[in-house]
């Protein structure tokens, strides 16, 4: 009886150990599965983050976001095409959108004319740096959108001074765009000159020759003679004479010839001896008006000027 009891206890102990081993294995498996689940969850989140924020996108954003320290100098030296490319740029530079800086430089440097897109006079925000004063157009977002569309579709969105500078560039290159010449000849300032001349440019030369003379005379002279105040004044002989005399003083032969169409008597009687002598030397010798004028001088008491010449 004692032997049977001890045998039964030993078997029960073995069963308990076996059950504990199984429980331990099962617990280990459960723990491993739990760790795998946690790791898998975290790993999937990391993968999700990588898909949403790829490295190249982060790098690109960082590259765009940095404003160069010399941004104003770059804007000042930028081409018109480069400035147009910045008209969609919303980043802030010294408290104002970069697109406003680009438009301001376009207006100041390239004489872009945005007045056709505005229903009010254009005003500017003035900002001063140690080197210069910057003018930023004071316009709202809707106006800016219209202006961008206009500048990107209009071939020649320039003011009168802008067209003058294009003509200067083209003349220096020896090739003038016909569309630019056409628009230049229809500027308010140029039409004012043609009104002054009363057809003299057609009688003695051509419209293209007149445009060439004006370009050669320089920007400042042209716009000072054709300022708004002068254009709003009644056309007179005095205005015409002042205009042409200014170009005669610049040694323009065409201006001297044009003076003879309507003002030969004025030249003959009003010019000093030295002025008349210089004037005669400018005249194209084969022109009809030149021959006629020299004949008048030869029949006057100023014949000595011809003999001296």
UniProtKB/Swiss-Prot annotation:
Location of the protein in the cell: Membrane
Transmembrane intervals: 23-43
Main location: membrane
Superkingdom of origin: Bacteria
Record key words, sorted: Membrane, Transmembrane, Transmembrane helix
Membrane topology (UniProt): Single-pass membrane protein
One CC-aspect GO term: membrane
Entry's family note: Belongs to the chlamydial CPn_0593/CT_474/TC_0759 family.
Protein name: Uncharacterized protein CT_474
Organism for this UniProt entry: Chlamydia trachomatis serovar D (strain ATCC VR-885 / DSM 19411 / UW-3/Cx)
């Amino acid at each position: 009886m004692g032997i049977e009891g001890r045998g039964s206890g030993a078997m029960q102990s073995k069963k308990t150990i076996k059950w504990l081993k199984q429980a331990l294995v099962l617990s280990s498996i459960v723990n491993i599965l739990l760790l795998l689940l946690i790791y898998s969850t975290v790993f999937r989140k990391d993968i999700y983050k990588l898909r949403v924020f790829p490295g190249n996108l982060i790098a690109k954003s960082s590259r765009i976001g940095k404003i160069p320290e010399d941004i104003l100098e770059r804007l000042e030296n930028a081409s018109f095409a480069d400035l147009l490319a910045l008209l969609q740029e919303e980043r802030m530079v010294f408290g104002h959108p970069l697109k406003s800086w680009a438009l301001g430089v376009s207006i100041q440097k390239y004489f872009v004319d945005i007045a056709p897109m505005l229903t009010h006079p254009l005003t500017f925000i003035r900002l001063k740096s140690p080197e210069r004063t910057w003018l930023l157009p004071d316009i709202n977002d809707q106006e800016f959108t219209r202006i961008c569309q206009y500048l990107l579709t209009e071939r020649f969105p320039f003011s009168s001074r802008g067209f003058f500078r294009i003509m200067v560039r083209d003349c220096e290159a020896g090739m003038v765009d016909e569309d630019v010449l056409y628009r230049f000849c229809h500027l308010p300032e140029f039409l004012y000159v043609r009104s002054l001349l009363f057809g003299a440019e057609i009688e003695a030369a051509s419209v293209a020759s007149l445009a060439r003379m004006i370009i050669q005379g320089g920007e400042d002279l042209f716009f000072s003679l054709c300022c708004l105040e002068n254009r709003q004044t009644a056309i007179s002989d005095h205005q015409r004479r002042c205009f042409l005399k200014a170009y005669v003083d610049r040694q323009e032969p065409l201006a001297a010839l044009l003076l003879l169409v309507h003002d030969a008597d004025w030249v003959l009687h009003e010019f000093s001896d030295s002025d008349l002598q210089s004037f005669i030397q400018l005249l194209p010798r084969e022109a009809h008006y030149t021959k006629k004028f020299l004949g008048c001088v030869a029949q006057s008491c100023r014949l000595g000027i011809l003999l001296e010449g």
